[in-house]
Amino acid sequence: MIGETLAKIFGTKNSRVIKSFRPTVNHINELEPKYQAMSDDELRAQTEVFKKLLADGKTLEDILCDAFAAVREASVRTLEMRHFDVQLIGGMVLHQGNIAEMKTGEGKTLVATLPAYLNALTGRGVHVVTVNDYLATRDTEWMGQIYRFLGMTVGTIVHGLDDDERQEAYNADITYGTNNEFGFDYLRDNMKYSRGHFVQRDHHFAIVDEVDSILIDEARTPLIISGPAEKSTQLYYQVDVVIPRLREEDHYTIDEKARTVVLTEEGVKVVEGGLGVDNLYDHKNMEILHHVNQALKAHTLFKRDVDYIVKQGEVIIVDEFTGRLMPGRRYSDGLHQALEAKEKVKIENENQTLASITFQNYFRMYEKLSGMTGTADTEAPEFKKIYDLDVVVIPTNMPMIRKDYPDVIYRSKQEKYEAVINEIQELHRSGQPVLVGTISIDDSETLAKMLKKRGVPHNVLNAKNHEGEAQIVANAGQAGSVTISTNMAGRGTDIKLGEGVKELGGLHILGTERHESRRIDNQLRGRSGRQGDPGSSRFYLSMDDDLLRIFGGERMSKIMDTLGMEEGEPIEAKILSRGIENAQAKVEAHNFEGRKHILEYDDVMNQQREVIYRQRREILSGESLRPNIEAMIEDLTEGIAAVHADDRTHAKDWDWEAINDDMYAQFGIRVQVDDEIKDKIKSQELGDILYQTAIEVYDAKEKSIGSDQWRNLEEYVMLRTVDSLWKDHLLSMDHLREGIGLRSYAQQQPLIVYKKEGFEMFQEMIDKIQEEVVKLLFFVRFEEEPEKIEEIKPKEQEMTFSHGGDQAVKKKPVQRKDDKVGRNSPCPCGSGKKYKKCCGA
């Protein structure tokens, strides 16, 4: 009551925001005669004028009024449509990076042209996001007339385009497309092996049409690209035949503490002979080498009935801490398949995640995000919390005169359907068009059968019958028309009233059930009463409806009994309407928590995804990877020194054999240190010696085939390793996510555990990338002409597309020119810090 009184005196926040735009609207209107007086060529030339103003230091705000006035005039000349004042306000709301709630028929599509043109003047591209290919294509052709008139280019992203077509569309000033296509293109770009093949530009500015549908309704379903983990299981069987021939010590050595196993030189020869391979470490045989290593682990490090059991033809992991079986969990990186080959059971192909992202995290990448919809105000808190978007309700151009009648409630669904059919028949006889909204395909088909029996002609629009959607919706306003539609069908297409329909009361909306969300109900109502047209709406409900049955509970039934309802008799009561609204509020709160929950988990993956994608882009940048490789070699040699060298004992007493074994396992080299040096060497100096030895070997390998070819190989090996281990990490994170809910039984917070263990797994993957990259580069040998190396690229994988924190700035490793500075030595830059904490970080 007090709030209402204050609102009357001071106005609501929304009314104050709208009022603040009025002076700008007035200025745009004052500019109208100036632009009307221009010739077509003069008007078109304004685009270059605006671009020059921006180049000279003006801001978008400085040129907003002129740009909007130019778009308005171009629209009049091309489409014969003039932007209303309220549409100018909508354009300003979008430009500011907020959500404009505009009722159906208020021209959201036309509104988007204003901020799209203005922001495209920067040359960085604008993405206009729609819910389906039809709307993306329609809006490109329709609104594209305005942009092209003003000298702008327009592109469309729809399903079925090849990369060249996509690249061309993204390079346009303004690009229309669906949310799915934009998201999948981002994921696909980050799986490519050349920057020249990327299709997307920066994520600069996005205008999301039907923003509630895309950012809220679809937020619970991530975009996923998946593919078979292995194309064939045959290689596992072939390798498994060879491994049992190997003998410990002669052919391989085991480090039980580190749980690693390494082939000896003799072992490599046996494997090469058994598989008919000339050189196991040739770059062509990297996949075979990976299978050999996994099979070797399966046979030597993993024991049946200790690490796993075989039950009903399946290899089931045993939890090492609890001893419990973990059905459904699988080792990653091909190890599980190697165990299946070892145990002679069926090798299962895994369809694993190759890349995924939620819409929440995709759209939060844009520097500026905005949206339009007819219904957003009910979800305003969620838009603010998740996306930092304010919702501004734009006034209608003409007063809304639609009559929204109270709900009528029946005891059973059958009684409700009978009443609905009677109402439709009566409206059809009078000639008033009716749009019947259902919440399921099943309901729409049930009503269609009942109407057919009564002989009432009608159209049905649902997911099974979506061909000609736009035509069916467009005809729904003709006299005598009966259209049965699922609630979300036909969004984006206006229902225009046919001749004589206004006199009959306009389009009548008949809802057959309340949706879980008030917003969806409002969308259905909003199909009627556009642009000041007459119209009406009413919902028919029953106690059998899911919403009332599940969330209304016994209380609603008791109220019905108290009111003394007879069979077939409807009831209208405010207390029931309040009960329905309370039920909807409960569901909306529950769904919000679900979406927030998904986002909290995906935020963990998002931070990791950003690191990997940034690393891939650095690899593909064309800059030399030599400094990165040197830093990896340094870390690994220092690690070996740290494990085996202790300054508390004399260097002669260090385990030199173990040092050499580790150097051989990682680099394929052995280090000879004179006794004279051993008398005075310290652990840090050992790290320097190991590093220098490794670098000399690395330089020799590079020299043998030439620097340019070696750079190509470095890029190939790093990409292949990052992609392979990232793919396996995604699978491991999927498994962790699936089982994390059970941690609550152990009095643990699942999200906290997921963050902690996910970070540990990610750190392990980063370490493994370093080890694998260096090992492959040191062990690779060439039997063919070196110039063929540049042709090597990882194989494209079969892919399936399903709709299902602060970034640290990475310093580039310092490239050494003179003698190496010890990691613990003072930094030569003079900061006073240790080198590893300063320039060597």
Curated annotation (Swiss-Prot):
It holds the Pfam family SEC-C. ATP binds at residues 87, 105-109, 494. GO terms for molecular function: ATP binding; metal ion binding; protein-exporting ATPase activity. InterPro entries: Helicase_ATP-bd (IPR014001), Helicase_C-like (IPR001650), P-loop_NTPase (IPR027417), SEC_C_motif (IPR004027), SecA (IPR000185), SecA_CS (IPR020937), SecA_DEAD (IPR011115), SecA_motor_DEAD (IPR014018). Zn(2+) binds at residues 827, 829, 838-839. Monomer and homodimer. Part of the essential Sec protein translocation apparatus which comprises SecA, SecYEG and auxiliary proteins SecDF-YajC and YidC. This is Protein translocase subunit SecA.
